[in-house]
Curated annotation (Swiss-Prot):
Belongs to the FAM83 family. Residues 1-283 are annotated as: DUF1669. This is Protein FAM83B. Keywords: Cytoplasm, Membrane, Phosphoprotein, Proto-oncogene. Interacts with EGFR; positively regulates EGFR inducing its autophosphorylation in absence of stimulation by EGF. Interacts with RAF1; displaces 14-3-3 proteins from RAF1 and activates RAF1 within the RAS/MAPK signaling cascade. Interacts with AKT1, PIK3CA and PIK3R1; activates the PI3K/AKT signaling cascade. Directly interacts (via DUF1669) with casein kinase isoforms CSNK1A1, CSNK1A1L, CSNK1D and CSNK1E. Probable proto-oncogene that functions in the epidermal growth factor receptor/EGFR signaling pathway. Activates both the EGFR itself and downstream RAS/MAPK and PI3K/AKT/TOR signaling cascades.
């Protein structure tokens, strides 16, 4: 195959465009050899003989003659000084240097290739033309802006002003490397001495000298050139390169030009500087102090003085015995590796782009026969690096100046675990020597994310601060400050936890009657009512769409009373807490009594819902004594519930399960009663558990007739059962709270018992009659109700929710005398007033919430005498509480009571002295409302019966724990929205807020009188 030279000889026109004729001439080399060996005259004679012109300038001739170094005369040569013509003057280019390369011990920023962007160059001239700043001012500005490193390469440096800026930068912790021409170094040294500065003793400045190439003659004589490069590299991001030398004359006299370079081209200057630094040497004037600094070891890079520095290929290989036996090879600990010049990788560089996917083309074995060292990961990293600093792995060096023997003993390296700076090669020095074997591997993406979070203050810490250890502790703390990424994750995690804990949409009420969190915020915030109500309405819609898992309770229409049972016990018309005697076991009942056939036999331990509240202690005698002063002390209830009853806990777990099953009843806030802290330890959502609790004993007939009040009925009955209850309840706590309706329900006739058994049959005739019953009740809308409809405008969501509310027909109202204990007038009750009847039932439904235990305990005798004992005929109106026509989804649970209504009303306001004793028909009226049909217009009815005292109203809830108030964050009991503001039923947090309750009582009396 023909070569290019053969083709060129055949056809002279076939030459490459890049071909350049060689300019080398042999007589050039011979003339230089004669000049070195014989001087200037022999050199000129040779040019005449060869008939060539002079090619050297006089300055060059003088430089060669001045700097030539001749070899010593050898005995092998003859006495006539004749030279052997066979000797060659060719230059020797070794593959490896036999001199170790120095380390960048002050640190060097690592710039990932390709991240600097496009190259941008600005030209500056001296004297300045279009720029405001001169070249010298620009140099000073760049030095002031340096934050990491200043790398200066200069032929001659004698400018005092620039030198002062460099020294000041070193005091800020900026690493300063200065490379000067060896032939002009003496000028720099003289300048520093005149300024009174020993530059070799400055902790953050390294000054070294660089000389040009060596020219070797045929006889072995040689001379070297100068280092004429001039550039300033700042933070490996900006370069000033040009003809400007750091001398006074260049500022005032000489013309010069420089380039300000940024971008990708800076990487070339970065590599060039590290190449020059690798071939630099310590000046002879500094050699004595340098040798004293490293006298305790073989070399700086071998004895660990340049701590944590990744040794370059030349420096490590030059200090090893390639073919000798390695001593201490069995000691594979960190101290051995460190002392032998083997250091861990930079923690960032282990995951950088340079490390991944790079396979060295040549991996020499510098360990000889030592196979163990061959497989050390630190060793492998050092083998594939190129010579010195020209493109090898970034160097790792300490930021604390621990490279002095004195400071190294006082400041041993610590294990710094914080990830190093992303822009510093030497950043891993802050982490101490971390072994490769126990460092967990991390992804490069994680490392890159950590680099981005490094702030400027932390980046500045990549340079040494001081010799002492004061700033060591400060940096130790700074490096452990939480990063933005970790802080954000922690904040989001805490926010999710707090959001979950503060979400009370599914929460059950706690012991004080309010949802979790109501005690802490918004006591008097009416906005919470609307917000929570709207939320409940959305829950209502979901309950309409999704069928409840728990079957609805069967409904049966009472043929005798014309009403039907409701599945929502929480909205019973006349359900009100009864008064509680002073004995701790006043309302206890037997737990071993047989259950009715229609009642499923479920354990009582699983009845109560689980709440975010403390449990009632086993003995409540102390709590009862605190409320015997005649007024309510509701704040004490929180501190009374400290004990935990296992039975109560099991009871709550079952109730929570029932609550979750029945999605149409998120919370049943209105279905709580019997607030006495000593007598009622559980409360039950009667919608789910009314058929599961055991019925109380039937009260004696003579007791019902002779008793003057409902309170006496229950009180006497409880006294009869006190001994049996104590025997069955060894803890002495209340396990059941008996309501008047429950007591009278046992006294029903046989016909009513059969009627109660029909409630479990869904296909009963009474179940089918319910629709027609509602229609008749709707048609019986009286003018009074229509009149009140326009007066009382309830919110939209109240009207939406009360779609199933029904009215009571006129004929039914004739059979239901109305109960109004607080009315002052003695006029006969209006038997046909459907509005008063409807509103009275609404109020009594609202009063299903609790009464202060203190006022029940301290009920006066005249209050007990206020209500005559009901006759046996009343029992037919007191069927199991609840109306079937009531909304099955408990829509008026939206009524979120205001927090100020939580505390109970004081007892003196609860007993009006001027009210006459109502007749037996009035009492029947209160119980007949349990059997009435609910109306959607009830929210607009008069509130004439809203002022009746709750102490006389029966309580149909069973197994309910003490609840301090009726105001919960989410009130899911069925009641009228107008009665939401009836503070006479609920405790308020502030005692003076009972004035509002008194006002409502007076307002109700006024309305009733007008009728």
């Amino acid at each position: 195959m023909e070569t290019s030279s053969m083709l060129s000889s055949l056809n002279d026109e076939c030459k490459s465009d890049n071909y350049i004729e060689p300019h080398y001439k042999e007589w050039y080399r011979v003339a230089i050899d004669i000049l070195i060996e014989h001087g200037l005259e022999a050199y000129q004679e040779f040019l005449v003989q060869e008939r060539v012109s002079d090619f050297l300038a006089e300055e060059e001739i003088n430089y060669i003659l001045k700097n030539v170094q001749k070899v010593a005369q050898s005995t092998a040569h003859g006495t006539d000084d004749s030279c052997d013509d066979t000797l060659s003057s060719g230059t020797y280019w070794p593959v490896e240097s036999d001199v170790e390369a120095p380390n960048l011990d002050l640190g060097w920023p690592y710039v990932m290739p390709g991240l600097l962007g496009g190259t941008h160059i600005d030209l500056l001239f001296h004297p300045p033309r279009a720029h405001l700043l001169t070249i010298k001012e620009t140099i000073r500005k760049m030095i002031k802006e340096a934050r990491k490193v200043i790398a200066l390469v200069m032929d001659i440096f004698t400018d005092v002003d620039i030198f002062k800026e460099i020294v000041e930068a070193s005091t800020r912790g900026v690493s300063v490397y200065i490379l000067l021409d060896e032939s002009n170094f003496n000028h720099f040294l003289n300048m520093t001495e005149k300024q009174g500065c020993s530059v070799q003793r400055l902790r953050n400045i390294r000054v070294r000298t660089v000389k040009g190439q060596d020219y070797l003659s045929k006889t072995g004589a040689k001379f070297h050139g100068k280092m004429e490069q001039k550039f300033l590299l700042v933070d490996c991001q900006k370069v000033m390169y040009g003809s400007y030398s750091y001398m006074w004359s260049f500022e005032k006299a000489h013309l010069s030009m420089v380039q300000i370079i940024t971008g990708q081209l800076v990487e070339s200057f970065d590599e060039e500087f590290r190449t020059l630094y690798a071939r630099s040497c310590v000046p002879s004037s500094f050699a004595q102090e340098e040798s004293a600094r490293v006298k305790h070891g073989k070399a700086l890079w071998e004895n660990g003085t340049y701590q944590h520095s990744v040794s370059s290929l030349a420096s490590v290989s030059s200090q090893r015995n390639l073919f000798g036996r390695q001593d201490k090879i069995h000691k594979l600990d960190s101290s051995y590796f460190k002392n032998r010049g083997i250091y861990t990788l930079n923690e960032h560089d282990k995951y950088n782009i340079r490390s991944h996917g790079y396979k060295p083309h040549f991996v020499p074995n510098f360990n000889g026969p030592n196979a163990i060292r061959q497989f050390q990961p630190n060793q492998i990293n050092e083998n594939w690096k190129r010579h010195s600093y020209a493109g090898e792995q970034p160097e790792t060096v300490p930021y604390l100046l621990l490279n002095r023997a004195l400071n190294r003993t006082n400041n041993p390296p610590g294990n710094w675990k914080k990830p190093s700076d992303s822009l510093s090669v030497a950043s891993s020095s802050r982490e101490g020597y971390v072994s490769h074997h126990n460092t967990p591997a991390q992804s490069f993406a994680n490392r890159l994310a950590q680099r981005k979070t490094t702030n400027l203050a932390d980046r500045n810490s990549n340079v040494r601060r001081s010799f002492n250890g004061t700033d060591n502790h400060i940096r130790f703390l700074q490096q452990r400050m939480p990063t933005l990424e970790h802080t954000t994750k922690s904040f989001l995690r805490n926010w999710r936890i707090e959001s979950y804990l503060n979400d009370h949409s599914e929460a059950t009420p706690d012991s004080n009657g309010s949802a979790l969190g109501d005690r802490f915020e918004g006591y008097d915030n009416p906005e919470n009512l609307k917000a929570n109500a709207l939320y409940t309405h959305s829950r209502l819609r979901s309950s309409l769409v999704f069928k409840p898992t728990l079957p609805e309770q069967k409904e049966v229409n009472s043929c005798t009373t014309g009403s039907s049972n409701s599945t929502i016990i929480g909205s019973q018309g006349s359900e009100t807490p009864k008064e509680v005697p002073d004995t701790p076991t006043n309302v206890q009942h037997l737990t071993d009594k047989p259950l009715p056939e229609s009642i499923p036999k479920l354990p009582l331990q699983s009845e109560a819902p689980k709440m975010h509240t403390l449990q009632v202690p086993e003995n409540h005698s102390v709590a009862l004594n605190q409320t015997t002063n005649g007024h309510t002390e509701s704040n004490n209830y929180i501190y009374k519930t400290l004990g935990v009853n296992k039975q109560t806990e099991n009871l709550k777990n079952q109730q929570t399960e029932n609550l979750l099953k029945r999605r149409s009843f998120p919370l049943f806030d209105n279905s709580k009663a019997n607030l006495d802290p000593g007598n009622s330890k559980h409360y039950v959502y009667s919608t789910l558990t009314r058929n599961r609790v055991r019925q109380p004993e039937k009260p004696k007939e003579d007791l019902l007739k002779s008793s003057k009040s409902m309170h006496n009925v229950t009180h006497n009955l409880e006294e009869d059962e006190e001994e049996v209850t104590k025997r069955n309840s060894p803890s002495g706590t209340t396990t059941k709270s008996v309501s008047i309706a429950a007591l009278l329900d046992v006294n029903k006739e046989e016909s009513n018992k059969e009627l109660a058994s029909k409630k479990e049959v869904k296909g009963s005739p009474s179940f089918l009659k319910k629709g027609s019953q509602k229609l008749r009740s709707l048609l019986s809308l009286t003018p009074d109700k229509k009149e009140n409809l326009s007066k009382n405008k309830a919110p939209a969501f109240y009207r939406l929710c009360s779609s199933s509310d029904t009215l009571v027909s006129e004929g039914e109202e004739n059979q239901k005398p109305k109960k109004s204990d607080t009315k002052v007038d003695s006029s006969p009750r209006r038997k046909h007033s459907s509005s008063s009847n409807s509103q009275g039932s609404i109020h009594k439904s609202k009063e299903d919430v609790t009464v202060s235990p203190s006022q029940e305990i301290n009920a006066p005798p005249d209050e007990n005498k206020r209500t005559p004992s009901p006759g046996p005929v009343e029992s037919k109106f007191l069927e199991r509480a609840g109306d079937a026509s009531a909304p099955r989804f408990n829509t008026e649970q939206i009524q979120y009571r205001d927090s100020r209504e939580i505390n109970a009303v004081v007892t003196p306001e609860r007993r009006p002295t001027s009210s006459p004793r109502p007749t037996s028909s009035e009492l029947l009226r209160s119980h007949s409302t349990d059997r009435r049909v609910y109306s959607r217009f009830e929210p607009f009815c008069k509130i004439e019966s809203s002022i009746q005292p709750t102490s006389n109203m029966p309580n149909t809830s069973i197994n309910r724990p003490e609840i301090k108030s009726a105001t919960m964050g989410n009130s899911y009991g069925r009641s009228s929205p107008l009665l939401n503001y009836n503070t006479g039923v609920y405790r308020s947090y502030q005692p003076n807020e009972n004035k509002f309750r008194g006002f409502m009582q007076k307002f109700g009396n006024f309305i009733h009188k007008n009728k």
